[in-house]
Amino acid sequence: MSLRTEMIERLEQLVQLERPWRDLAHTCSCPAALPGWQLAWWRHVAPEGSLLRAVAVFENKDLVGLAPFFVNPGRRVDYRLLGAGTTHRISPLAVPGREREIAALVARTLAGSSPRPDLVAFEGIDIASPWPQIFVESWPGRFRPWRYVASIHAAPVLGLAGGFAEWLAARSGNFRRKMAQARRRLEVEGGSIGLALEPATVEQATQAFADLHFRRWQGRGGSSLAQSVHALLDDAAADLVERGEMRLWVVELGGRPLCVSVFLAAGGETLSFNSGFDESRGDLKPGLLAMFAAIEDAFARGERRFDFGGGATSYKLRFTSEDAPICWTGIVPHTGRYQLTRLRLAPDQARWLITRIGRRMPSAWRRQIKRIARRR
């Protein structure tokens, strides 16, 4: 059967695809691509002046692929995916097993779109995703686009085969003791851990997340999240919480939230979005307790994998040693701005190469370089 594409430039057109879009996100096990999340991001977080350029792929009347891009405002025409800069492991969607034909069709459609792309970015995409390279190979024209890689980051994951008890038994005795002690201490002080499910508690949880998160990062140079994250969470929660596609784990003490951790879920995959917690009660380990509860819950639901998101921070590595890296990559088609675009990407490329070289360098050499740098 032949495939056809449709370029979607108006929000109301995209909203009409919400049901098959959701089904596709579940089929692809891609929580970051859930429509309730990405539409809320578009309404509240997308840069002002952005243009919607989503490519839908149909087989007869069935949606078999969706690449929800937007044009980032600026002199250079950058095509980015909805959720870029906010959510990790975002990706276009395609019926499994048909990624190549669908991605190739999306690439050809974008090549003819207006405004013409100077750059197509895949930010925080799974490093194993075939989409960027298929774009390189399928983009029409005499010359292939140049593919760049701006950065690669570890992204810890936990396979949920077996049961929670089996996983916990495999962790170190020290980890088990610390978690049990933290739970007991919270209970002794009258605290609790639970999911926010009712509209009133959901609203309280999203507000508490924003308050706790931004307060924590205020003295550390600020958060990478937009200030509009509360509006994003509120909007998304109205669509996602009831179906279990958004989970707000709240650690409370004396009726006051100590931690709110936000997770997205689709197709057997749980993705950690972010959290906010009260550092003044760090002795109770509220962030670890919320993560522990979310993992136990994911096991109970029979899910396949738990994704901790980008960054191999120490608290994540207490739960797992598995890694599924994510990368910031993209393509630069041969347009009139090709050379200028490559030139502007050069600093990011240089930083990435230096980082790669540094990681491969013997540790003794790295220490010596740091000593020399400190003397200057």
Name what the model sees in each region:
Residues L3-Y79, I125-S151, A155, G159-D283:
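A conserved beta-strand-loop-helix scaffold within acyl/acetyltransferase catalytic domains
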Residues W41-R43, I90-A94, I102-L105, A155-L160, ...:
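Low-complexity, flexible helical/coil segments
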Residues L51-L52, F58-E59, V71-S151, A265-A324, ...:
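Acyl-donor binding region in acyl/amide transferases
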Residues A107, A169-R177, L343-Q349:
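Short intrinsically disordered coil segments
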Residues W167-L168, G222, E279-R281, E296-A298, ...:
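A short, structure-level motif marking secondary-structure boundaries and short turns
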Residues R366-R376:
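Short linear elements at protein peripheries
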